[in-house]
Amino acid sequence: MAHAAQMGLQDATSPIMEELISFHDHALMIIFLISFLVLYALFLTLTTKLTNTNITDAQEMETVWTILPAIILVLIALPSLRILYLTDEINDPSFTIKAIGHQWYWAYEYTDYGGLIFNSYMLPPLFLEPGDLRLLEVDNRVVLPIEAPVRMMITSQDVLHSWTVPSLGLKTDAIPGRLNQTTFTATRPGVYYGQCSEICGANHSFMPIVLELIPLKIFEMGPVFTL
């Protein structure tokens, strides 16, 4: 999860997030090189006293500053399109979970396990235990297996919401009357936090998402669904 004074992204817990971190580093390197080139050109402009007032055109220079940005855009677009394709790819998910946004809590349905339905509310500060995280803990966590493809079906009962878990690289809008879907495969067990990422009213900041990822064998035993 995120912590104070954090400089980078959260640690990846899914292949998609690993791809996003790699793309972030790739784009950051290109931005750094562009910034260095611009600063170098400005430095030369400010320190060089020679001028030539007879230049009317510069075909070579215009060709360079037209082709070079096009190449840079292609270098950014190609890996971005690849990640977009991967996020939309759904390959025979093992489990399907439905998340429904409400003002201001989440409801979940385990349709593959007897139609289990429960609500997930943020825990008020008075109910927090030592070590719990303020504004991030919930009364009922979403328990899911690792190393198994999970499909999330996401919608809303009232206004626009957004189901977001940064460690998994997930951010899917919850839209009333529409069912969006996304898939992920978690690679590490643990507890991971997210929040609604679409301003949805007065208590928008109090819609945390908590995923508890456990080994598949433990998940299939069943008692994890006891609320």
Curated annotation (Swiss-Prot):
Subcellular location: Mitochondrion inner membrane
Alphabetized GO MF terms: copper ion binding; cytochrome-c oxidase activity
Membrane protein topology class: Multi-pass membrane protein
Catalytic activity: 4 Fe(II)-[cytochrome c] + O2 + 8 H(+)(in) = 4 Fe(III)-[cytochrome c] + 2 H2O + 4 H(+)(out)
Transmembrane segments: 15-45, 60-87
Essential cofactor(s): Cu cation
GO biological processes: ATP synthesis coupled electron transport
Mitochondrial intermembrane face of the membrane: 1-14, 88-227
Cofactor binding summary note: Binds a dinuclear copper A center per subunit.
Domain of life: Eukaryota
Keywords linked to the UniProt accession: Copper, Electron transport, Magnesium, Membrane, Metal-binding, Mitochondrion, Mitochondrion inner membrane, Respiratory chain, Translocase, Transmembrane, Transmembrane helix, Transport
EC number: 7.1.1.9
Amino-acid positions noted as binding Cu cation A1 in the UniProt annotation, renumbered to this chain: 161, 196, 200, 207
Residues the entry annotates as binding Mg(2+): 198
Binding, Cu cation A2: 196, 198, 200, 204
Any Gene Ontology CC annotation: mitochondrion
Similarity comment text for this entry: Belongs to the cytochrome c oxidase subunit 2 family.
PANTHER family: CYTOCHROME C OXIDASE SUBUNIT 2, CYTOCHROME C OXIDASE, SUBUNIT II
Subunit structure: Component of the cytochrome c oxidase (complex IV, CIV), a multisubunit enzyme composed of 14 subunits. The complex is composed of a catalytic core of 3 subunits MT-CO1, MT-CO2 and MT-CO3, encoded in the mitochondrial DNA, and 11 supernumerary subunits COX4I, COX5A, COX5B, COX6A, COX6B, COX6C, COX7A, COX7B, COX7C, COX8 and NDUFA4, which are encoded in the nuclear genome.
Known role: Component of the cytochrome c oxidase, the last enzyme in the mitochondrial electron transport chain which drives oxidative phosphorylation. The respiratory chain contains 3 multisubunit complexes succinate dehydrogenase (complex II, CII), ubiquinol-cytochrome c oxidoreductase (cytochrome b-c1 complex, complex III, CIII) and cytochrome c oxidase (complex IV, CIV), that cooperate to transfer electrons derived from NADH and succinate to molecular oxygen, creating an electrochemical gradient over the inner membrane that drives transmembrane transport and the ATP synthase.
Protein known as: Cytochrome c oxidase subunit 2
